[in-house]
């Protein structure tokens, strides 16, 4: 499943485990170039591709042409009739919950993560709420609350942070409450924005630990 809608619509509901490579706005030729690169790197494996656009028309038509030009076998490209508009009428077809995606989650112990604080080759991202973050966090972390992780607003905030402030070539350590839902949700958002990211790791670090044990805590 390849979703080619713009972020605003995509963030409101997507097919679970679908991939995302936008072709909207259609007049933006740079998106066609990005899709060409994405297709060559990620879609050239002989598997069938089901395209999801807004209504199953213009976006899917343009994406089909781009994929064909990128070398994808035309007989393996399908358009989902009616696009996301039709899928939205099917109970449970679209979701904003990304925590159960098929991905090989990586974890690191809190102490090992703390030892990486200050490493210029590692990015730390704290996705806890603002008050919890202020009560104690690792030095030098970016912060983006994902407490309401399944809302378009929270996901858009995460998307923009990944786009504007994160380095796609460096690994990311994500800190949430327990290393579960918030971190997993953020993983998917970061992955989608930074598709060539080397490594993303969920970590659970209990901030009630005494700060003298971990001088890297603020």
Model segments located where?
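Structural scaffold elements adjacent to functional motifs in cytosolic proteins
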Residues: 1-3, 124-126
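Rhodanese-like catalytic fold shared by cysteine-dependent sulfurtransferases
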Residues: 7-50, 54-122, 129-173, 177-218
């Amino acid at each position: 499943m390849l979703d080619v809608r713009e972020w605003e619509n995509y963030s409101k509901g997507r097919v679970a485990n679908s991939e995302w490579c936008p072709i909207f706005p259609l007049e933006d030729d740079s998106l066609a170039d990005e899709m060409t690169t994405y297709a060559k790197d990620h879609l050239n494996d002989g598997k069938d591709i089901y395209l999801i656009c807004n209504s199953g028309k213009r976006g899917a038509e343009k994406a089909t042409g781009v994929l064909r030009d990128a070398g994808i076998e035309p007989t393996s490209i399908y358009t989902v009739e009616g696009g996301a508009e039709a899928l939205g009428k099917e109970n449970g077809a679209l979701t904003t919950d990304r925590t159960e995606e098929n991905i090989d989650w990586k974890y690191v112990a809190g102490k090992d993560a703390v030892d990486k604080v200050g490493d210029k080759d590692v990015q730390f991202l704290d996705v806890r709420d603002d008050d919890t973050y202020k009560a104690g966090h690792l030095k030098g972390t970016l912060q983006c609350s994902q407490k309401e992780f399944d809302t378009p607003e929270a996901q858009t905030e995460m998307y923009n942070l990944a786009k504007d402030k994160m380095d796609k070539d460096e690994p990311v350590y994500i800190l949430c409450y327990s290393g579960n839902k918030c971190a997993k949700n953020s993983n998917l958002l970061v992955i989608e924005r930074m598709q060539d990211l080397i490594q993303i790791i969920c970590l659970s670090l209990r901030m009630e630990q005494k700060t003298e044990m971990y001088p890297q805590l603020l």
